[in-house]
Amino acid sequence: MAQALNSTNIAFFRVAFLFTIAFFCLKNVNSILQNTYFIVLTQAMNLPQLTLSRYSGQLGLFALLFTLNGVHDLIPLLENNVKYFQSVVPVRLLIFFILTSISYLWESNFYVHNNSVFIYCFAEVWINFLLYNAIREEKNEEFKRLNQFMVNDEDIEEPQPFTVKTETTEIIEIINDEENDDEDGKDNDDNNEKGNDDSDAKK
């Protein structure tokens, strides 16, 4: 399920969603406006229902806008332009969230306060939210892979400061012992020389 909801599949789903709306705007827009689920959601949200004639000249303009909006995502998607989606998806999500709120709350303006504007903006919020989460997860995984955060416990080497300190102490003790031996040898030689001088003086 997680592999199916990657950023590429969600982006293709949005492109197909926009092309489908554009097709029905030219074919028969009432296939969408009179859909059962569409009407149920309209009544549940207590929104005015938009009615359009299937021969309205405005539908050609709507179809063109939806088609261009889909192509606007399709070209970067085919080029695998990840930076484009990382930049545009958060902004687009914010814009559609604001439009959804305005469409529901601004009851005096029937240009935006109707079921078609609200449901379309709500669908865009849902799709872009899924796309934003997928892009963020893929970005985090790529960051972890590049910085090698996943390190095995066997690869970690524990430092050994105490062993080094012990060896240094032993070396110092050996040097001190050698110095003491040299001093004792010098004292014995001095004593022997003094003894020889005393014996010569007595003779």
Curated annotation (Swiss-Prot):
Any one GO BP annotation for this protein: mitochondrial genome maintenance
Annotated region Disordered: the residues are 175-203
| Biased composition range(s): Basic and acidic residues | 188-203
UniProt keyword terms in alphabetical order: Endoplasmic reticulum, Membrane, Transmembrane, Transmembrane helix
The protein depicted here goes by the name Protein ILM1
Q: Tell me the residue ranges located in the Cytoplasmic compartment per UniProt.
A: 1-3, 80-92, 136-203
Please give the residue ranges for the topological domain Lumenal. Answer: 25-58, 114
TM helices/strands, residue ranges? 4-24, 59-79, 93-113, 115-135
Any one Pfam family here would be Ilm1
According to its UniProt record, where is this protein located?
Endoplasmic reticulum membrane
What more the UniProt record tells us is:
Present with 1160 molecules/cell in log phase SD medium.
| Ranges annotated as biased composition (Acidic residues) | 175-187
The family note in this entry says:
Belongs to the ILM1 family.
What GO cellular component term, any one, is given?
A: endoplasmic reticulum membrane
Its main subcellular localisation, reduced to a broad class, is endoplasmic reticulum
Report membrane topology. Multi-pass membrane protein
